[in-house]
């Protein structure tokens, strides 16, 4: 530990055994406050360093909860392998080299483990997070998909496959596919919709079904939203059969609530029959966003339909390619107009007048 004066302030540094370099704790107006901070850092390092990975992991979801319970359950699942192998070790004993080796073998677990060590770092239980800055590329999921990755023809094939493999329930599956691809709602939101949520040409997304906790919750951003209900989406619902007294728009083959696990069993034969075993229902949301951008809507407009609250930033980063194609088409149209002599003719008429 080191306390020293720099200008009019007092600085505190501690030695980091992993980086073998001093780490800055903070700057304080008086030496007394700096010494107190030094003692506090020493105490936290002494007590925090003794906590094992297993002990911290056990209390992590409780002491550092995320807003959604499903996220806490997901994180708990993702750290399980790491805890089983390193649970008896002290938090501060995990080196960056070990973290990198683990992350290379288990890239899908990296985000959750990094978040756990981040929380330990914020409370000064460890000096550094060994899982930060590893330079390991993680999957971008649905990002960077080409504009023609999912087309209208693909959607139609999925609908046809649904009718083929599911018999009397086929029209419901087909309607669900069409509805999701036109509205862009998330799967959990789709399974929570009620007929009363369709109001004219609008759809009110009030709730979402959480398949991990088997509960009904608010939509992802914590509040209801009103979006556009295209005519074809309404027609898809009106054309499908219903159970007597059915309240949810989309239900299972026997009228029960749809959850992720049950839907996967229904979805797998459909996508296989359509020749697209790589698809998930969430990809209908991607199709919706891509289609709206190709129709010339702005990223902020598409964000409203999808339920994003970032004014289109995520739409641009995830689905930016269609808008670029549309932009090039508009530029080409403008250039063609110029090269065809329209602009020159206008100038000549203006000069003559």
Spans of model-derived segments:
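Short, polar N-cap/turn motifs at the start of nucleic acid-interacting alpha helices
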Residues: 196-202, 278, 297-317
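Basic/aromatic-enriched alpha-helical hairpins
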Residues: 18, 40-46, 54-112, 116-119, ...
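Short, charged phosphate-coordinating catalytic segments
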Residues: 118-129, 180-204, 300-301
């Amino acid at each position: 530990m080191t306390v020293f004066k720099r200008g009019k302030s007092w600085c505190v540094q501690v030695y980091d055994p992993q980086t073998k370099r001093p780490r800055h704790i903070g700057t304080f107006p008086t030496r007394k406050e700096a010494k107190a901070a030094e003692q506090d850092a020493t105490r936290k390092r002494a007590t925090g360093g003794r906590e094992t990975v297993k002990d911290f992991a056990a209390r992590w979801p409780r002491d550092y909860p995320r807003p959604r319970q499903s996220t806490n359950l997901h994180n708990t699942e993702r750290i399980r392998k790491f805890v089983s192998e390193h649970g008896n070790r002290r938090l501060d004993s995990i080196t960056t080299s070990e973290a990198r080796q683990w992350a290379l073998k288990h890239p899908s677990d990296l985000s959750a483990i990094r978040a756990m060590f981040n929380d330990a770092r914020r409370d000064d239980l460890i000096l550094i997070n060994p899982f930060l800055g590893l330079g390991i590329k993680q999957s971008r999921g649905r990002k960077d998909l080409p504009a023609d990755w999912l087309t209208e023809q693909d959607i139609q094939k999925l609908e046809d496959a649904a009718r083929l493999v599911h018999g009397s329930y086929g029209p419901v599956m087909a309607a669900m596919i069409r509805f999701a691809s036109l509205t862009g709602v998330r799967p959990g939101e789709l399974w929570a919709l009620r007929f009363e949520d369709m109001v004219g040409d609008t759809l009110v997304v009030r709730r979402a079904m959480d398949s991990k906790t088997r509960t009904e919750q608010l939509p992802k951003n914590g509040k209801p939203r009103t979006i556009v209900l295209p005519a074809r989406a309404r027609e898809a619902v009106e054309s499908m059969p219903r159970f007597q007294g059915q309240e949810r728009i989309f239900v299972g083959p026997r009228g029960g609530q749809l959850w992720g696990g049950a839907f996967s069993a229904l979805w797998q034969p459909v996508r296989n029959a359509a020749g697209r075993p790589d698809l998930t229902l969430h990809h209908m949301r991607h199709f919706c966003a891509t289609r709206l951008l190709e129709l010339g809507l702005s990223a902020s407009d598409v964000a409203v339909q999808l339920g994003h609250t970032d004014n289109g930033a995520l739409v641009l980063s995830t689905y930016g390619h269609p808008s670029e194609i549309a932009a090039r088409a508009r530029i080409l149209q403008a250039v063609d107009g110029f090269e065809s002599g329209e602009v020159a003719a206008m100038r000549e008429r203006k000069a003559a007048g």
